[in-house]
Each structure stands twice: as C-alpha cells, then as structure tokens.
C-alpha cells in the first residue's frame, strides 16, 4: 500500500511539473513585457488550469509542446503562462500576479490565449481549444498578427 501511495505521489508530482518551467515559457508578467520590448515581439499569454482543465491539457499536449509551434514561437513570440492550478500551490507572488492577470484578461473560461503587445494591450483573444494541431495553430496566429499589423 505504501508503495502504491509513493507511486501515485510521484505520478502526481510529475504531472504537476509537466507544464511548469516548460522551455521557452515565462511566468513573470514584468519579465514577459520587458522581453517583448527588447525583442520587438508580441506576447502570447496562456491562461490555463494546467492540472485540472482538460482542454488546457489537450492544448499543451497537442499544440504548445509540439516542434512546429515551439520553433515558430521561439522566433516570433514571447510566451507567458499564467496558471491557475488546483493541485499545485503557487508562490504568494505568482498567485497575486495571476489573480491580477485573470481580472484584466480572463472573460469566459480556460484556456484563454491572448496575443498582446509589449505594453499589454490586447491584440486578439482565443477562448477554448482550437482543432487542427500545431501547424494550423501557427497559421492562425500568423493571420491574427497580420490583421493587427494592418490596423
């Protein structure tokens, strides 16, 4: 029984960290804005429930962790994750920051993916999971950015 409990604890801990520290993603809002300014890139912010939201988990697994997306994002976006987990405790600072981001940007539900300029001005908003995989997701982002560039 103890071995089963230990195995389950390891599995939960591993799953909890599957999203945290994902390569290329920052979790600090000020860092994301500074990086966006320095690199002259828009911010893609993912408001997610990484350990409880099925659509968020699917989006991460099928899009955000795939090579087609990560390569495009590395060259063209600043990636930020604002997580609202139920099983993982965030630091008080991160909780406070994410609560403010939720108040400012979350209107309907998870996942919410926003494209923002370096000042935090909303360029576009996507609520829920978008079918089609990483290539289609990248194409959609490119189209959204092209539309905002024309404005």
Regions found by a protein language model. Give the residues of each.
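Hydrophobic beta-strand anchors of alpha/beta hydrolase catalytic cores
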Residues: 44-45, 53, 79, 113
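Short pre-active-site segment immediately N-terminal to redox-active cysteine/selenocysteine motifs
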Residues: 40, 48-52, 109
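A short beta-strand-turn-helix
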Residues: 26-43, 73
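Conserved redox-active cysteine motifs that mediate thiol-disulfide chemistry
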Residues: 48-64
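Sec-dependent signal peptide recognition
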Residues: 2-10
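Thiol-based oxidoreductase modules, predominantly thioredoxin-like and allied folds used
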Residues: 23-26, 66-96
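Non-catalytic, surface beta->alpha helical segment in thiol-disulfide oxidoreductase systems
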Residues: 62, 104, 108-149
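Boundary at the C-terminal end of the N-terminal hydrophobic targeting segment
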Residues: 18-20
